[in-house]
Regions:
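Beta-strand secondary-structure signal
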Residues: 68-72, 95-97, 130-134
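Solvent-exposed edge beta-strands and adjacent loop segments
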Residues: 1-75, 112-126
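Short, cysteine-centered beta-strand-loop-beta hairpins and adjacent loop/turn segments enriched
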Residues: 76-80, 139-140
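A generic structural signal for short coil/turn motifs at secondary-structure boundaries
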Residues: 80-82, 119-120
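Short, acidic/charged, Gly/Pro-enriched secondary-structure junctions
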Residues: 81-107
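Mixed-charge, glycine-accented linear interaction segment located at domain edges/termini
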Residues: 106-151
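Acidic surface patches and DE-rich sequence motifs
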Residues: 51-52, 100-102, 138
Length: 151
């Protein structure tokens, strides 16, 4: 049993409609990403300061964080690609759910995001698909919500 949310995670996707996964969503497992490539990154929100003469800060506020989910998939013989793209652009809005290797640990759900892909090739890895999910404001709640399977 793990204490933290690490290891081989299960990454699943479904369609997002009106800012949330559709009705009772049917989550579809994505092929296992390349080792060490699945990551959720937060970018700190913009800091806004009210300055008085002399440059002293009277007040400050910060906008909300922005989030991005990234992962790389191998192109494998006999397997279909997870999404069709048009020169890197993947149509529609998507939702993602990540369940850690130890299902009792906390993962996350993203209700709404856009998805793009960058294709590359090296002789070491073959054809790789680098997916980038830009997280968008959901219908309700936080942009990245905690998720624990069975909870």
């Amino acid at each position: 049993m793990a204490t933290i949310s690490w290891g081989k995670a299960l990454l699943e996707t479904t369609t997002s409609n009106d800012g949330a996964p559709e009705g009772t969503p049917t989550w579809k497992a994505i092929d296992t990403p390349k080792d060490g490539t699945t990551k959720l990154t937060a970018t700190a929100g913009q800091e806004i300061e009210a300055l008085e003469e002399g440059g002293e800060v009277v007040d400050s506020r910060r906008s909300k964080n922005k989030y991005q989910l990234e992962f790389d998939l191998f192109v494998k013989k006999g397997k279909e690609r997870a999404w069709e793209d048009n020169d890197g652009i993947i149509a529609g809005e998507h939702a993602f759910r990540l369940t850690p290797e130890d299902e009792g640990c906390e993962g996350f759900i993203i209700d709404r995001c856009t998805l793009s892909v960058e294709e590359s090739f090296t002789t070491a890895d073959g054809i790789m698909l680098h997916y980038v999910a830009k997280v968008l404001k959901p219908k309700t709640g936080k942009m990245v919500k905690p998720y624990t399977k069975g909870a």
